[in-house]
């Protein structure tokens, strides 16, 4: 299961709690077609990579986090380690690209 981070405080706490594990966050929106298409694949990846932590942020419900992370398009998948954003990210419903970046950064 992939949980939603509903507030900026939830986001900050999730990164802190993850320690040095890779965290992947799907910045998504309920009205975004490509977001809905990749959502089941994202859940599959959470099962495929049990050593990686997966979350979602709805950009409309948690706009404070979306703004702080400079999200311009959905879906955007950002990667974090030790509480810091990595330079890698994936924009768009690119399953192969997302899987590749997870393997590279975990």
Swiss-Prot record:
GO terms for molecular function: protein-disulfide reductase activity. One of its GO terms (cellular component) is cytoplasm. It comes from the Eukaryota. It comes from Geodia cydonium. The lineage of its organism: Eukaryota, Metazoa, Porifera, Demospongiae, Heteroscleromorpha. Belongs to the thioredoxin family. This is Thioredoxin. InterPro entries: Thioredoxin, Thioredoxin-like_sf, Thioredoxin_CS, Thioredoxin_domain. The record marks 26 as: Deprotonates C-terminal active site Cys. Disulfide bonds join 32-35. It is found in: Cytoplasm. PANTHER family: THIOREDOXIN-LIKE PROTEIN 1. Residues 2-106 form the Thioredoxin domain. Keywords: Cytoplasm, Disulfide bond, Electron transport, Redox-active center, Transport.
């Amino acid at each position: 299961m992939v949980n939603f981070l509903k507030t900026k405080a939830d986001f900050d706490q999730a990164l802190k709690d993850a320690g040095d594990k890779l965290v992947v966050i799907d910045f998504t929106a309920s009205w975004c077609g490509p977001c809905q298409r990749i959502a089941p694949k994202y859940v599959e990846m959470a099962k495929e990579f049990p050593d990686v932590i997966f979350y979602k942020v709805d950009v409309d419900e948690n706009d404070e986090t979306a703004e702080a992370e400079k999200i311009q398009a959905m879906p955007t998948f950002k990667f974090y380690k030790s509480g810091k954003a990595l330079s890698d990210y994936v924009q768009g419903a690119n399953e192969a690209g997302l899987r590749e970046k997870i393997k590279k950064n975990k």
